[in-house]
Regions:
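A short gly/proline-enriched turn/hairpin at secondary-structure junctions
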Residues: 54-65, 79-84
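A mature extracytoplasmic/lumenal domain signature
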Residues: 51, 61, 94, 108-109, ...
Length: 141
Protein backbone atom coordinates (compact mmCIF):
# COMPACT_ATOMS: atom_id res chain seq x y z
CA UNK A 1 0.00 0.00 0.00
CA UNK A 2 1.35 3.36 -0.92
CA UNK A 3 0.48 6.74 0.48
CA UNK A 4 0.22 9.18 -2.33
CA UNK A 5 2.39 12.19 -2.13
CA UNK A 6 2.89 14.88 -4.70
CA UNK A 7 5.78 15.00 -7.07
CA UNK A 8 3.80 17.02 -9.58
CA UNK A 9 1.91 20.27 -9.59
CA UNK A 10 -1.56 20.00 -8.12
CA UNK A 11 -4.43 21.22 -10.26
CA UNK A 12 -6.50 23.50 -8.07
CA UNK A 13 -10.27 23.37 -8.26
CA UNK A 14 -12.24 26.60 -7.98
CA UNK A 15 -13.09 25.77 -4.35
CA UNK A 16 -9.44 26.26 -3.37
CA UNK A 17 -8.68 28.94 -5.92
CA UNK A 18 -10.63 31.63 -4.07
CA UNK A 19 -8.30 34.34 -2.71
CA UNK A 20 -8.82 33.31 0.92
CA UNK A 21 -7.96 29.70 0.15
CA UNK A 22 -5.11 30.16 -2.35
CA UNK A 23 -2.45 29.94 0.39
CA UNK A 24 -3.93 26.58 1.40
CA UNK A 25 -3.43 25.06 -2.04
CA UNK A 26 0.15 26.35 -2.16
CA UNK A 27 0.94 25.01 1.32
CA UNK A 28 -0.60 21.61 0.57
CA UNK A 29 1.27 21.40 -2.72
CA UNK A 30 4.56 22.23 -0.96
CA UNK A 31 3.94 19.72 1.85
CA UNK A 32 3.15 16.98 -0.67
CA UNK A 33 6.20 17.78 -2.79
CA UNK A 34 8.45 17.63 0.29
CA UNK A 35 6.95 14.30 1.29
CA UNK A 36 7.44 12.85 -2.22
CA UNK A 37 11.02 14.07 -2.24
CA UNK A 38 11.53 12.31 1.09
CA UNK A 39 10.16 9.05 -0.31
CA UNK A 40 12.33 9.26 -3.42
CA UNK A 41 15.45 10.16 -1.38
CA UNK A 42 14.89 7.28 1.04
CA UNK A 43 14.25 9.68 3.94
CA UNK A 44 11.43 8.16 6.00
CA UNK A 45 11.17 11.06 8.47
CA UNK A 46 10.78 13.54 5.64
CA UNK A 47 8.25 11.32 3.89
CA UNK A 48 5.96 11.07 6.95
CA UNK A 49 6.40 14.69 8.09
CA UNK A 50 3.16 15.58 6.27
CA UNK A 51 1.11 13.37 8.64
CA UNK A 52 -0.54 14.67 11.82
CA UNK A 53 0.42 12.80 15.01
CA UNK A 54 -3.15 11.45 15.25
CA UNK A 55 -3.58 10.60 11.55
CA UNK A 56 -5.40 7.47 10.44
CA UNK A 57 -4.41 5.40 7.41
CA UNK A 58 -6.91 3.01 5.82
CA UNK A 59 -5.26 0.04 4.10
CA UNK A 60 -6.64 -3.19 2.61
CA UNK A 61 -5.50 -4.90 5.83
CA UNK A 62 -7.24 -2.46 8.17
CA UNK A 63 -6.85 0.84 9.97
CA UNK A 64 -3.45 2.16 11.10
CA UNK A 65 -3.75 4.77 13.86
CA UNK A 66 -1.17 7.47 14.53
CA UNK A 67 1.92 8.81 12.82
CA UNK A 68 4.21 6.47 14.78
CA UNK A 69 2.30 3.41 13.54
CA UNK A 70 2.23 4.76 9.98
CA UNK A 71 5.99 5.32 10.17
CA UNK A 72 6.51 1.76 11.46
CA UNK A 73 4.41 0.40 8.60
CA UNK A 74 6.68 2.06 6.03
CA UNK A 75 10.01 1.47 7.81
CA UNK A 76 10.80 -1.86 6.05
CA UNK A 77 10.82 -0.01 2.70
CA UNK A 78 13.51 2.40 3.92
CA UNK A 79 16.68 0.38 4.42
CA UNK A 80 20.32 1.05 3.72
CA UNK A 81 19.82 4.79 3.29
CA UNK A 82 17.37 4.42 0.44
CA UNK A 83 13.90 3.32 -0.54
CA UNK A 84 13.62 -0.26 -1.78
CA UNK A 85 10.23 0.14 -3.46
CA UNK A 86 10.96 2.59 -6.26
CA UNK A 87 10.15 6.13 -7.28
CA UNK A 88 6.83 7.65 -6.17
CA UNK A 89 4.81 10.13 -8.21
CA UNK A 90 1.19 11.00 -8.55
CA UNK A 91 -1.31 12.82 -10.69
CA UNK A 92 -3.87 14.85 -8.75
CA UNK A 93 -7.48 14.43 -9.78
CA UNK A 94 -9.04 16.98 -7.45
CA UNK A 95 -8.06 19.34 -4.65
CA UNK A 96 -11.08 20.84 -2.94
CA UNK A 97 -11.40 23.16 0.01
CA UNK A 98 -13.99 21.95 2.49
CA UNK A 99 -13.77 24.86 4.91
CA UNK A 100 -10.96 27.22 6.01
CA UNK A 101 -9.18 24.46 7.94
CA UNK A 102 -9.85 21.34 5.83
CA UNK A 103 -9.11 20.28 2.26
CA UNK A 104 -9.56 17.06 0.32
CA UNK A 105 -7.05 15.77 -2.22
CA UNK A 106 -7.85 12.85 -4.55
CA UNK A 107 -4.99 11.57 -6.70
CA UNK A 108 -3.59 8.60 -8.61
CA UNK A 109 -0.26 7.40 -7.20
CA UNK A 110 2.33 5.50 -9.20
CA UNK A 111 5.31 3.64 -7.81
CA UNK A 112 7.90 2.80 -10.47
CA UNK A 113 10.38 0.12 -9.47
CA UNK A 114 13.22 -1.58 -11.31
CA UNK A 115 11.05 -4.45 -12.50
CA UNK A 116 7.44 -3.39 -12.01
CA UNK A 117 5.04 -0.48 -11.68
CA UNK A 118 2.20 -0.22 -9.16
CA UNK A 119 -0.61 2.31 -9.29
CA UNK A 120 -3.75 3.15 -7.34
CA UNK A 121 -5.91 5.92 -5.96
CA UNK A 122 -5.66 7.89 -2.73
CA UNK A 123 -7.95 10.23 -0.86
CA UNK A 124 -6.23 12.52 1.64
CA UNK A 125 -7.98 14.75 4.17
CA UNK A 126 -5.80 17.68 5.20
CA UNK A 127 -6.31 19.80 8.30
CA UNK A 128 -4.63 23.09 9.05
CA UNK A 129 -2.66 22.71 12.27
CA UNK A 130 -0.92 25.90 13.30
CA UNK A 131 1.01 27.13 10.27
CA UNK A 132 1.05 23.74 8.52
CA UNK A 133 -1.36 21.54 6.59
CA UNK A 134 -1.23 17.92 7.81
CA UNK A 135 -2.82 14.71 6.58
CA UNK A 136 -5.34 13.57 9.18
CA UNK A 137 -6.90 10.76 7.12
CA UNK A 138 -5.40 8.72 4.28
CA UNK A 139 -7.31 6.10 2.31
CA UNK A 140 -5.15 4.47 -0.35
CA UNK A 141 -5.92 1.57 -2.62
Amino acid sequence: MIVAVAAATIAVTPALAAPDRAPASVAIREAMAASAAGWNAGDLARFVAVYAEDAVFVTPKGLVRGKAAITARYAPSFTGGGNTRGRLSFVPAELRGIDPTHALLVARWTLTGATSTETGMTTLLFERRGDAWKIVADHSS
